[in-house]
Design a protein with these regions (language model features):
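Cleavable N-terminal export/targeting peptides
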Residues: 1-35
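Transmembrane beta-barrel domains of Gram-negative outer membranes and organellar outer membranes
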Residues: 24-283
Length: 283
């Protein structure tokens, strides 16, 4: 059984690894210039697809991101999620991404108490990649850790660890990205159960900025109150990517926006529809 202590250690280890690397690098000259060159070279070796609306990217990212989600439940109550556990992603080392994910604020519009969700961090390693001229694919593995910092039951009862495998392949203007992962609680496993999450996104590049997409977001419950159940959503969406904010071709500063609607396709679902709006600043 995974312990609470292990989940905390995963989060602390992530922070120490990245912080230690940054501290050592900062002691040398040209820290920021070296960082920029490393990020530029690293990202140039993978496809330039935009991050899907819900599915995690199969490549590495250096981005600040926030999402806004409105979930409409079968009882016709709606819940707003401000932030949706997004934050800042950086590439501190070659082939490695580190994310600090800000707790979302949950507004229920019901008798449930509003409040903040859990704090999370994520470490991703890119296993293999080729840009559009060299295979047009990417493959990575990530490990996320979540701490139960939520207020008024707006987070998990215990810390969790989430290993995920992410892959993507491009075919001209079309790309398909898919992730398969699990959410493993550190305690109260009989009550919370274990969850397997499988997301797949298909995107098509139209014109200069338009990326229409269709996603499938599936969740499989093992143990807990929803043992044996499956929840699935089909999510049509549109990403607008990317609007460069500087003329310098070496400058990566750019804006990406998008939106879509999750539509429940299974008999069991915690909400009928989910409006998802997103804004990302690449840097």
């Amino acid at each position: 059984m995974i312990s609470n202590r292990l989940a905390v250690l995963v989060c602390v280890a992530m922070a120490m690894m990245v912080g230690g690397s940054a501290l050592c690098a900062a002691q040398s000259e040209g820290f920021f210039a070296s960082w920029e060159d490393r990020v530029r070279d690293t990202l140039a070796q993978q496809p330039s697809w935009p991050i899907p609306l819900v599915t995690a990217s199969s490549g590495l990212l250096q981005v600040a991101r926030t999402d806004f989600v409105r979930q409409i439940a079968p009882a016709r109550t709606d819940t707003w999620n401000y932030g949706n556990t997004k934050g800042v992603n950086v590439v501190p080392w070659y082939k490695i991404e580190f994310d600090v994910l800000v707790p979302p604020y949950i507004q229920h519009n019901s008798k449930a108490e509003d409040g903040f969700g859990d704090f999370s961090m994520l470490l991703k390693y890119r296993l293999a990649a080729g840009n559009e001229a060299h295979g047009n694919y990417s493959l990575s593995f990530s490990l996320a850790g979540t701490l139960p910092t939520g207020s008024y039951k707006n987070g998990s009862l215990d810390a969790t660890i989430s290993p995920t495998l992410c892959g993507g392949k491009g075919f001209g203007r079309l790309d398909v990205q898919s992730t398969l992962g699990a959410i493993l609680p550190a305690g109260d496993t009989a009550k919370l159960g274990r969850v397997v999450v499988w997301n797949t996104a298909t995107q098509y590049h139209l014109g200069k900025f338009f990326w229409p997409e269709i996603e499938n977001n599936a969740t499989f419950y093992h143990g807990g109150a929803n043992d044996g159940r499956v929840q699935d959503f089909v999510t049509p969406g549109l990403m607008l990517s990317k609007f460069k904010l500087e003329r310098d071709p070496r400058n990566r500063l750019a804006l990406v926006v998008g939106g879509g609607m999750q539509i429940a396709t299974t008999h069991f679902h915690s909400y009928n529809h989910g409006l998802v709006l997103t804004a990302r600043m690449l840097f």
